[in-house]
Amino acid sequence: MAKIIGMVSTSHVPSIGSAIVKNLQDSEYWKPFFSGFKPIHQWLANHKPDVVIVFYNDHGLNFFLDSMPTFAVGAADHYVNDDEGWGIPTLPPFKGDANISWEIINGLIEREFDVTTCQNMKVDHAFTLPLKLLWPESATCPVITVPICINTVQFPLPSAKRCYNLGKAVGEIIANLDSDLKFMILGTGGLSHQLDGERAGFINKKFDLDFLDSLVQNPTWATQYSIEELVEKVGTQGVELIMWIAARAALPGQVRQITSTYHIPISNTAGGIVLLENT
């Protein structure tokens, strides 16, 4: 049977891509963030996942405000990146596996998640940059990917509890796949930040650290809060942490933390990184 071997979650702000292009990884501003990936690179080299399930949000490349699904799953054999206007070079297509995607889609429908199915899907920086951070030396991403897009842009947004249940369902589906593939879960976005309005620049360090701590022993902790309460605590864009919640929920059983990094600010955002593996 298929096996989930671990989870990585990371921030995905576009300025990360600019820092990579400009070779700023060792600069005073960026080094604390990029250095957090060194133990993750070693872990990936040792464990070699075959498939990565990516929980992310779209910022207008594939979906826009006039058509924004709550949950969408890619069901293609490749996914393309495109210019978003950030000055970040587009990346080569990412490998998919439509058969794996359809197993997940069918399983979610059976569990009463009404997902949008995308047989042609563009993926933006929220998907591409985290994968580039994981495999920085690879010209093309070396793993099969399955994009699972969660709406964090157009209200109403799915609750943290709903996203937890989504991730849990995905984990159950993977565990029942008749396959010897090794799966890793990737959650992207956050942590606390707000890009506009009266609270532009808002960061809540205490909540971020409490949230990071909860991922190991109490992964449902943040589900006590409504979306409106999360916006108050982490900012309008900080609600991207619901992707982390979904990713964590996909991990079965007990987990242990291999590494965790928290660095502020990266482009007015609280930067977070975590690697958990099953015990």
Task: Tell where the protein language model's regions lie, with residue ranges.
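Beta-strand elements within well-structured catalytic alpha/beta cores of enzymes
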Residues: 50-56, 148, 181-189
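A contiguous pocket-lining binding segment that forms or flanks enzyme active sites
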Residues: 168-175, 181-208
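Flexible, D/E/H-enriched segments
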Residues: 1-50, 62-165, 176, 198-279
